[in-house]
Each structure stands twice: as C-alpha cells, then as structure tokens.
C-alpha cells in the first residue's frame, strides 16, 4: 500500500473534476480525499496499490469531458484513510 499526493493543473474546477475524481477513486478501491484549492488546482491524497494509484492518476490526467488538464504532479504522500472523501476548498 502506497500513498500519493497528486495535484491537477489546468481547467479542473467548475467542470465536475472533483466529483468525477472521487467516483473514479471509489470505483478503483482507493482511499483518501480530494479537494479544490484556492489557486485553481485540485489536490488529491490517495492510498492504494501502485496499480490503483496509477489508474487514478491516468483518470486525473484525462479528467471529465469539460476539463482541460495541463499536468498532474505526483509526490509521496502520507496518511491512513478509511474511505474516500470530498473535502471543502482550501
């Protein structure tokens, strides 16, 4: 089990990205959280197998139809999670 901290850049707010990301994470069995950031990015802390995390990162790069994802930054994360939550904007 690994934990990744991922940040999506581009047109990722106001397009259903956060909710879609949560749905994808839950479908993949990933635990953690997603939230919008005041700087216009979407931040994810996700815990799962490497295969689950790579699949979520691939979803994040594609995003929902209305999104335009410029890039997704990935770095090691931390935390233990029971489920996957939508968090308020920070």
Curated annotation (Swiss-Prot):
- Where the record annotates domain Acylphosphatase-like, the positions are 3-88
What does the record give as EC number?
3.6.1.7
Which positions are tagged coiled coil?
none
Q: By its UniProt entry, which PROSITE patterns does this protein fall under?
A: ACYLPHOSPHATASE_2, ACYLPHOSPHATASE_3
Q: Which UniProt keywords apply?
A: Hydrolase
Concerning Pfam families, the annotation shows: Acylphosphatase (PF00708)
Q: Name one GO molecular function term.
A: acylphosphatase activity
Fetch the InterPro entries from UniProt. Answer: Acylphosphatase (IPR020456), Acylphosphatase-like_dom (IPR001792), Acylphosphatase-like_dom_sf (IPR036046), Acylphosphatase_CS (IPR017968)
Judging by the UniProt lineage, the source's domain of life is Bacteria
Main EC class the enzyme belongs to: hydrolase
* Enzyme active site: 18, 36
Q: Where are the transmembrane segments?
A: none
Q: Which reaction does it catalyse?
A: an acyl phosphate + H2O = a carboxylate + phosphate + H(+)
Under the heading PANTHER family, the entry gives: ACYLPHOSPHATASE
Q: Write out the similarity annotation.
A: Belongs to the acylphosphatase family.
Protein's name according to its UniProt entry = Acylphosphatase
């Amino acid at each position: 089990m690994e934990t990744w901290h991922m940040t999506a850049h581009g047109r990722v707010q106001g397009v259903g990205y956060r909710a879609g990301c949560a749905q994808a994470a839950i479908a993949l069995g990933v635990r953690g959280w997603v939230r919008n950031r005041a700087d216009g990015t979407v931040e994810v802390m996700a815990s799962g197998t490497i295969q689950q995390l790579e699949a979520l990162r691939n979803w994040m790069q594609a995003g929902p139809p209305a999104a335009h994802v410029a890039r997704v930054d990935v770095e090691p994360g931390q935390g233990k999670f029971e489920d996957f939550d939508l968090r308020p904007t920070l």
